[in-house]
Amino acid sequence: MRTCLLDPVQGYYATANTPPGTFDALTETRDVLGARGDFITSPEVSQVFGELLAIFFVARWQNTARDAPLRLVELGPGKGTLLADMLRTFARFAPFYRSIKDIHLVETSPGLMELQYNAIEKALEGTGKRLVSADQEVVGEDEIRVEWFPLVDSVPIRSDSWTMVAAHEFFDALPTHIFERSNDGFKEVLVDVERGGQSGITVLKPGDLTSSSKPAVGGPPKFRYVTSPGPTPWSLLLAMRNKRFNSLQPGQRVEISPEAWAAARRIGELVSGRKAAEVAPEVEEESAKTARLQREAERVQTPSQGGAGLIIDYGDEKAFGGSFRAFRSHKIVDPLEDPGKADLTANVDFWHLKSALFTTDARPLRLMYQAHFLQALGLGPRVEALEKAAANDERRADISSAAKRLVDPTGMGAQYKVLGVSSEASSGGSAEAVAKAKEPADKVYPFEMDEGSGGASAEKQA
């Protein structure tokens, strides 16, 4: 998945929306988002989606960190549509908007970076804000720094800024491993070249420059799925040691993404403004333990402004075993066909993400259906206002249709889930004080309401 999606020359996202000739004559470029692309996302459907996400962040800031400078972090911003819609909404709240100092984006595609920059510039027009270089040390009240990072782990943890993190359809594209239960443990599902009955082992004599086997006639080799002959290091680490998968029967499969776990942990660090605590080793010398406890004391004493996060993706609070697939031109296709020319994706295991967030000073909130989340934040009144302001009946019909698509119980409304992440501002203190601070000082709307409606949590099982 990593190679097919992120290869710097032939990768699906690296070549997305890149002008022809950027790489070489053989490298195709394409639209990946929207009607002309391979898939469409909620921000592309309606501006209301980004507006309501912005309202959530404004409300959290008003409740927790009114005096703090603001930073917006988005993972996988696509064309910048969600980012632009949020910025336009933020501009309506003057104190909040003035406090925004930095925008940090996780992106690898040069073509998409350019689209994102243009989207930000257009969103800032007429709002009293302008973009400045990431190298500028001091940011004025009318300026916003924007900076791109190749990895979420590259985004710096900041305790002096209230950090908003938006991860919309980011986790589904992270590389995943597939494991199959066998009678003696777990084997890993791998990708191999279709060899037409030949052995998978090719012996090269000293001095040979090429393999003695000839490529298949008629084009590039085809690929196939195979299982490892026995356990692999990944299957031992990720599947065998996880009690969640003890009940799987021989032949059943499970998809596990260590990169998703690491990215969720980083989101917790960004939102809380602190690095996560070190994990104590099973065996530790007394001097090493003393040094580790000293580092932990220093960590929890660091004041932090806190933050909030939203993770929006398709999946559930459980693991999946057969969700790995590919999209091309809005249709599901064989993931092994034409690598690098289709979007590869797998359902998100939100319990896997929560387990990572639990290791940080941030706290995961209840998982909600996208429909319930948007409706709770005012989708209905906002759509009514847009319909009243529409220039004609056709535009009104488009607005209504787009809104219905966002909350469709047979589509986006139920397939997409929203996981909130929260962290209260903290002045630091003892470990006990920090642990107590993780208890909610106030209920986070709409995740922690008493009505009980809107939840999307499944049983915490494989």
Give the ranges of each region predicted by the language model:
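Intrinsically disordered, low-complexity domain-flanking/linker segments in eukaryotic proteins
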Residues: F23-L26, E125-D142, V203-L204, S211, ...
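Short capping/connector residues at structural and topological boundaries
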Residues: Q10, N17-T18, D38, E44-V45, ...
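A mobile, often basic/glycine-rich helix-loop segment
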Residues: M164-A239, R325-P335
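Long, Lys/Arg- and hydrophobic-enriched amphipathic alpha-helices
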Residues: P233-A462
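A short, conserved alpha-helix within the catalytic core of class I
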Residues: L151-R158, F171-K187, R253-R266
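Conserved protein kinase catalytic core
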Residues: M113, L174-P175, A319
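Short, well-ordered beta-to-alpha junction loops that form the rim of enzyme active sites
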Residues: P77, H168-F170, I312-G315
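Rossmann-like AdoMet
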Residues: M1-L75, K79-T163, F179, W351, ...
